[in-house]
Each structure stands twice: as C-alpha cells, then as structure tokens.
From Swiss-Prot:
Keyword set, alphabetical order: Decarboxylase, Lyase, Pyrimidine biosynthesis
Protein name, per record: Orotidine 5'-phosphate decarboxylase
One MF annotation (Gene Ontology) recorded for this entry: orotidine-5'-phosphate decarboxylase activity
Known catalytic reactions: orotidine 5'-phosphate + H(+) = UMP + CO2
Subunit structure: Homodimer.
Alphabetical GO biological process terms: 'de novo' pyrimidine nucleobase biosynthetic process; 'de novo' UMP biosynthetic process
Residues engaged in binding substrate: 22, 44, 71-80, 131, 192, 201, 221-222
Functional note: Catalyzes the decarboxylation of orotidine 5'-monophosphate (OMP) to uridine 5'-monophosphate (UMP).
Annotated EC: 4.1.1.23
Enzyme class: lyase
Taxonomic source organism: Salmonella paratyphi A (strain AKU_12601)
Enzyme active site: 73
Pathway: Pyrimidine metabolism; UMP biosynthesis via de novo pathway; UMP from orotate: step 2/2
Length: 245
C-alpha cells in the first residue's frame, strides 16, 4: 500500500521506532518509504543519502508525512556547527545530532542556534560512543576508559550543555536513565529483532530489550528495509513493544 502526502502529512506517530534509510538510489528509497505508514515509524537520513540527494530528499519524506532524523553527526568549530544545526532546523527536521566529543562550547553553540525556533526546534542529540566501537577501538584513540565509561562521561557533558539527549548503546540505557533522568532522551542504534544478523553493529539488543532498558527512540535498519513486507514488520515490532510496555 502507498501512503501519499495528502493522506498522511498530518500523521503523528507515538512509535519509538526510527527506520534507517540506507540506499544508494533515491527511487529505491522512496519506493520503500511508499510501502510503510508514517504512523508506524520515523525515518533517519544519514551522511550517504544526504550527500547524494540533499535537502530535497528530506522534503520528499516530509511530504509523505514522516518525521525525519537528520543523522549527520556535526563535529566542527562552534560557529560552523551552530550554523549547520540552524540549517537543519530551517529544513524542518524532527531531530538532528552532533558529536559530544566536539566539546562543551560546540554543543552550547548548537543549542543556542536553535533558540529562535522555539517549539518548532528539532530535538538536539549528541553522539557519545559509536555502537561499532569496542574497548580496543577506544584504546587505539588513546582513551583508556571502557565504551560505557566514556559514553557516560560524554553524556554528562551533553546534559550540562542543555541538549535533549544522547545517542548511546542499549547496554548504557539503564544506567543513563538512572543517572540523567527520564526527560533526557536516549536514542539507540544497533536494535534488531530476534533472529536478525548483527551486521556491522557490535553492541545490539532487540526492540523489547531496548524498551525495557529505557531507550526512547530505537534505530532499526535492514531488518525493516530488507523485509519482504516492511509494513507488517513494523506493525509486528510496534505490537511487541506495546506488549512489553
């Protein structure tokens, strides 16, 4: 079934599911999107697709009724990052992110850049430790902490800078909710329904486990985008989350 802009542009989803769009071809991406319902998920656009297809892709998704998480992980000097975040807000995205390792001044500048947008500002999230990274990877970078310890340090800095939350692994979610409170949003990649392959993620969880751990928004990619029936897969995931809740 195809959901057109006219039928779904006002749709609001309560689902915590964010589907990662990872396509090399715009037409294939939109063909997939036209098979799913914006009431069942939000969509994430990352570096590859945004580089290939630009802001118009985001507009195409919004016209179909979807909230968009612009996953570009800005990491630059404060002024440049602030301008990029403001540009994302102008585009009307639902969520945008920066790297917490950019430091406090960069994150504060990004936060301040969203002040003029008021209630229409996107959620501003910081990336802590990429879910593909393990202790050995951090050691190669001169970081002697474990991924969990380093992520918590960066999450604390993020909260102190007034951002809305962090991207973290599901394994860190329980601790983060305890330390940073319920209002601090946790966005988690590496979520895969039981039976899915791990792919290039190293620290993964099922949707049900993630919800129990305190994750607010869970990013799911290939288990949905490569499903023979993605609409039904999304409905099954959401149904399982409602049972878990």
């Amino acid at each position: 079934m195809t959901f057109t802009a006219s039928s779904s542009s006002c749709a609001i989803t309560e689902s915590p599911v964010v589907v990662a769009l990872d396509y090399h071809e715009r037409d294939k991406a939109l063909a997939f999107v036209d098979k799913i319902d914006p009431r069942d998920c939000r969509l994430k656009v990352g570096k590859e697709m945004f580089t290939l297809f630009g802001p118009q892709l985001v507009r195409d998704l919004q016209q179909r009724g979807f909230d968009v998480f612009l996953d570009l992980k800005f990491h630059d000097i404060p002024n440049t990052t602030a301008r990029a975040v403001a540009a994302a807000a102008d585009l009307g995205v639902w969520m945008v992110n920066v790297h917490a390792s950019g430091g406090a001044r960069m994150m504060a500048a990004a936060r301040d850049a969203l002040a003029p947008f008021g209630k229409d500002a996107p959620l501003l999230i910081a990336v802590t430790v990429l879910t593909s990274m393990e202790t050995s990877d951090l050691r190669d970078l001169g970081v002697t902490l474990s991924p969990a310890e380093h992520a918590e340090r960066l999450a604390r800095l993020t909260q102190q800078c007034g951002l809305d939350g962090v991207v973290c692994s599901a394994q860190e979610a329980v601790r983060f909710k305890q330390v940073f409170g319920a209002a601090f949003k946790l966005v988690t990649p590496g979520i895969r329904p039981a039976g899915s392959e791990a792919g290039d993620q190293r620290r993964i969880m099922t949707p049900e486990q993630a919800l129990s751990a305190g994750v607010d928004y869970m990013v799911i990619g290939r288990p949905v985008t490569q499903s023979v029936d993605p609409a039904q897969t999304l409905k099954d995931i959401n149904a399982s989350l409602k049972r878990e809740a």
